[in-house]
């Protein structure tokens, strides 16, 4: 006996696809997007908040992929690590943090050195300068004998040539602190790779663990180093790992990684702590005391300064509890976002959850391959739809974000048009399955690629993001077109409750978001329906 085919809800997350009415530097408006344009004209749509307090960040803080996917998947406002750590500094508990003090005590008791490694910017996506300044205060109050700072330059979540201003803040702060030295500088392209391009990680690792200088005899002024690369047309993100002073990592040293976002720090930490490590030749360093701000990867077994909160009953877990099947697909750059982050930090799939990882192109920067792997992601998605077994399919298209980060407008426009073509194919497949297609984004980026001064902008934005609901004629919500209306002032936290509403599944109490669908006078759903209970 043939099983009845499932009419899926397909959630397509267009990473970095924000909304702006401005035309200048707006790759999304400039691009030819007939599919998205038609869907916006034909189907119910609204705009959602994807930044600031509505997604668990400080007021005015731009959103990012981790936060966006966590909020979408959680159906609630989750206090993000940026806020949690900032609050601990404000209420002084940071300075009494047991693990931070233990790292300092290790360096003191063994008369070794303490190393601080992390991204040096105020971008607030992976780290924050305030956290580094607070760490220096802890080390000073504990009288750590030697403190070496290894700075990773940004240029991706900040202006592309802003590193000197951030490093100056640190340099000025430690000017009269003789025990503190800025030891190395490395662009995030090398130190924060997350796509298993181990040659990049090796370059950062080698400088951290070697006393050799790549530029000239040490010590070297950070301004001279950065100007050296600026004059070669190399921006902050791509500064090669360089030593400007003494302070390599040696046996018995303590190390604190102060990035709070895990995905781009895993590889470097892995190279330092994993035994055996087979991705490149490493030094035989022993008795290291390694502390990470957050849980980068449970297999690394490092101490944690800020352990994760337990997050239950995200969308994936809820769907699984009802015995329904679900599917996640993304290319390498965003795979963790539709799995780990979307599931609230759960590394293993839930029962009934299938996953597909599509490899991102092996290029140095994505302006060399603006299509990325969007077409293959679409093929895998359509295949999952056609199986007729999945109630919920979650897809990420990485193009708008990854190309937006390059600052290359022409290539970003090309990537936007590629995604639009893919959405056309996806729309056809969902329509044929009588499913429901939801299109949204996790944060803005590609809609703002020029600053007011006309220079390249590579960072995320605080702009609203689209939410489009496209229903098949026999989908669970009656309407097919303009008969569904949305609440105003929604946020990403309302996406999961909306999906559960369409699936006719009861929202768990942990989900504080609300369904975006209102029972307008045109609404033909059964207003007295009883949600399916667990």
From Swiss-Prot:
Pfam families reported in the protein's UniProt record: iPGM_N, Metalloenzyme
Task: Write out the catalysed reaction.
Answer: (2R)-2-phosphoglycerate = (2R)-3-phosphoglycerate
Residue ranges the record marks as coiled coil: none
Active-site feature positions: 65 (phosphoserine intermediate)
Give the UniProt keywords, A-Z.
Chloroplast, Glycolysis, Isomerase, Manganese, Metal-binding, Plastid
MF terms in GO: manganese ion binding; phosphoglycerate mutase activity
Gene3D superfamilies named in the record: Alkaline Phosphatase, subunit A, BPG-independent phosphoglycerate mutase, domain B
Specify the protein name.
2,3-bisphosphoglycerate-independent phosphoglycerate mutase
In its UniProt entry, the species of origin is given as Porphyra purpurea (Red seaweed)
Q: Which gene name does the record give?
A: gpmI
